Structure formats: C-alpha cells, structure tokens
Amino acid sequence: VMPTHRPIEPSSVASIDVARAHDAHSVEKAVQDLAPRHDYIVIDTPGTDNFLSRVGHSYSDTLITPLNDSFIDLDVLAMIDPETYAMTRPSKYAEMVFQVKMQKARREKSNRTFDWVVMRNRTGQLESRNQRSMEEALTKLSSRIGFRQVPGFSERVIFRELFLDGLTLLDLKTPGTDIRMNMSHLSARQEVRDLMAAIGLDRETQ
C-alpha cells in the first residue's frame, strides 16, 4: 500500500496575516481530508523555524526529533556546559516546541499537547566516550525541556541502500524485493521495531 502524499507550500500572499491564515487553513484542511482514510499521518517539516512548520508541529500527537550523535547537533536542543553537560539555556527550537505545545492546548481547549521524543541517529556500532557523554547530556536535558529519549538507529549501509529503492526494513519480507536477509539486516530491523514500540506503533511491525 503506497502512502498518500500531500505537499503544502507556504502562501505567497504579500500580507503576513493573510499568508499565515492561508497556511493554517492549508494544514488543517490536509489533516481533515486525510484523517478519515488513514491510520497515521506523518507531517515532515523543514529544519527551519517558520509559521507553516509551527502549524505542522501543532497537529502532532508525537513529535520525533532525530539527532545525530554529535554535540554539534545537540545545539538544536540547548546550549550545554562542556564540563558538566548541564543546560545553560534552551535553543530556539526547544523554545518553539514549548510555544507550539501551548498553541495546540489553546486550539483544542485542553491540557493535552503532544509526546516529544528524541532519537539518536547514525550512532556508532562500538561504544565510545562521545556516546557516553551524549547519553549523559541528553538524560539531563530530557527533564529540563520536556522530551523523552527513544531507541535510535545505528550507522548502517542497509538504510542508505533501501532508500534508493524506496523501501524500508519492514518491506524485506515482501515478495519481489530480492534482498537476502543477514544478521546485520535483522539487527537493523530490530532497531526499527524498537523505535516503533517506543512510540506505540509496535503492532504495525509484526
């Protein structure tokens, strides 16, 4: 079954207020159109802070933030003291997530917001000092800015190979894929299953 794609472009109207109203309506209409016919909706937003991205965030039930295993990428979440790994201040993105949570609560007139999860991406196969330091920093950060850590993905060639064919590791049992499973593939598929289980979608990976 192929997913339904619905691209949403930012409004080109000159008036900021009118453009924002148009963008908000475009996202709302897309969600309303897709929801009755689909079990899940994935909203992929750019890495920049703009109004359309904020609206997309506000419709989240689960917000997934992938993070390369690097202190350079950790700046996306917060500024960190290099000695203690304690947060010195939240990043613009973390502040945006907090603001969007409030926006969602106001729109839905409830205290319900969304589950913000951070997954480490392209981690090394062998444990390193950097990995341990990242783990410590993220553990301290999670309680400060309100996310939880979920299992991430290791650096694996199979992810890049399957991308070129438009496949995921969950497609490998499908007839016609012609890919022989090995232990590395099985380990990678388990990583996907662990992530899905962590966000409550484990039934879909059986």
Residue ranges of predicted features:
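C-terminal lobe/tail of nucleotide-utilizing enzymes
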Residues: 107-206
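A general structural-boundary detector
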Residues: 14, 43, 67, 140, ...
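Conserved catalytic-core segment of NTP-binding enzymes
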Residues: 46-151
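Generic hydrophobic alpha-helical segments
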Residues: 27-31, 80, 191, 195, ...
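P-loop/Walker-type NTP enzyme "switch/lid" segment
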Residues: 1-41, 47, 82, 174-175
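A generic structural signal for ordered alpha-helices
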Residues: 12, 34-35, 58, 62, ...
